[in-house]
């Protein structure tokens, strides 16, 4: 069951992680200028979470005895408060990321976000006491080096219509977004550990629902202050792809981004925050390739090398996990054999 959850969450995360930045950049490339609106779209798809929650509720209700009450939500106040806090932080982090995408090519933004893995490793070590293995360290180093290699000659990717100041500002703000999200992932894992209730995937979905609701509220407040509600009808009419496609892009953006967040927190539940971070980093070079295909961004040799290093890091990490699992099973078998031998030898010694 755990392996199935890991695979499902990896697929969902891959769709969101690769598709989210591309469709967000599509909005900005075709006349979109509202950063808070783009921020809102990152979490606005949260109502789709009610669908699996409804199935979970129906299943629990059928399994209960007749007359027993079944609550739709399982989350308790302690985990609820944690979800609210993480949701507010995510709202501001999403704004930082949207600001960066507004002024940077997808390839450059992907490179910066890849650097968050090093920060995730540090925060995970201090916040959730995540132990490092040689394979984990090797994966972190390879993925970080891959991100650094990807950074070579990024200045040539600067959009023509943007100033150097806008480019640098977008670069620095995206770095801040990477660091902040690197803090959020272990914070979610810590919330799971301190929940004082048995974590299930239903609880993970409820946590995600509240997180996205609060992040969306932060975005709506930002949209109101920035005047986005007044500006959006005009922006839709002037959208280069047409008014109808403006709303299509908005809807698909909300749905695809929801996949990213669901996959990320689902991996934290079934594995750890570090694994979630490694998976995000592995997918970034794939986003690079898609950006080259759809937006005709340059694919220098550095990007090819970065892709190879990232895949190497991915393989290194999972090989280490497989080896670690085999070692644990071997130790458990040896301990069980020793226990059996000691129990058999005890009557002889007593005689």
UniProtKB/Swiss-Prot annotation:
Restricted to pollen. GO terms for molecular function: purine nucleobase transmembrane transporter activity; purine nucleoside transmembrane transporter activity. It is found in: Membrane. Keywords: Membrane, Transmembrane, Transmembrane helix, Transport. Coiled coil: none annotated. GO terms for cellular component: membrane. Residues 45-152 form the EamA domain. GO terms for biological process: purine nucleobase transport. Residues 329-351 are annotated as: Disordered. It is a multi-pass membrane protein. The chain crosses the membrane at residues 4-24, 35-55, 72-92, 108-128, 132-152, 168-188, 207-227, 249-269, 274-294, 304-324. Its main location: membrane. Belongs to the purine permeases (TC 2.A.7.14) family. PANTHER family: OS09G0467300 PROTEIN-RELATED, PURINE PERMEASE 3. May be involved in transport of purine derivatives during pollen germination and tube elongation. This is Purine permease 3.
């Amino acid at each position: 069951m755990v392996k199935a959850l890991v695979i499902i969450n990896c697929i969902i995360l891959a769709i969101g992680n690769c598709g989210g930045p591309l469709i967000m950049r599509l909005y900005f490339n075709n006349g979109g200028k509202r950063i808070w609106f783009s921020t809102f779209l990152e979490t606005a798809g949260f109502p789709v979470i009610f669908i699996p929650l409804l199935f979970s509720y129906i299943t629990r209700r059928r399994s209960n005895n007749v007359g027993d009450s079944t609550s739709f939500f399982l989350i308790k106040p302690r985990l609820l408060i944690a979800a609210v806090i993480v949701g507010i932080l995510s709202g501001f982090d999403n704004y930082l990321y949207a600001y960066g995408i507004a002024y940077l090519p997808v390839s450059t933004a992907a490179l910066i976000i890849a650097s968050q893995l090093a920060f995730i490793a540090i925060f995970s070590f201090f916040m959730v006491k995540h132990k490092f293995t040689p394979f984990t360290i090797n994966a972190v180093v390879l993925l970080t080096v891959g991100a650094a290699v990807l950074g070579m000659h990024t200045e040539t990717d600067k959009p023509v219509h943007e100033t150097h100041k806008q480019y640098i500002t977008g670069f620095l703000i995206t770095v801040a977004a990477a660091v902040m999200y690197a803090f959020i992932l272990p914070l979610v894992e810590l919330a799971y550990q301190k929940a004082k209730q048995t974590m299930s995937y239903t609880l993970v979905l409820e946590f995600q629902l509240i997180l996205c609701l609060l992040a969306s509220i932060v975005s709506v407040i930002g949209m109101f202050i920035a005047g986005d509600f007044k500006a959006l009808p005009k922006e839709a009419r002037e959208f280069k792809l047409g008014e109808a496609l403006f709303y299509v892009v908005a809807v698909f953006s909300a749905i695809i981004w929801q996949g990213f967040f669901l996959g990320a927190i689902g991996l934290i539940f079934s594995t750890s925050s570090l694994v979630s971070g490694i998976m995000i980093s592995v997918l970034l070079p794939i986003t690079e390739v898609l950006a080259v295909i759809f937006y005709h961004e340059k694919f220098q040799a550095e990007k090819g090398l970065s892709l190879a290093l990232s895949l190497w890091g991915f393989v290194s990490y999972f090989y280490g996990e497989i080896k670690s699992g085999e070692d644990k099973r071997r130790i458990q078998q040896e301990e069980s054999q020793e226990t059996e031998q000691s129990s058999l030898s005890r009557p002889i010694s007593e005689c």
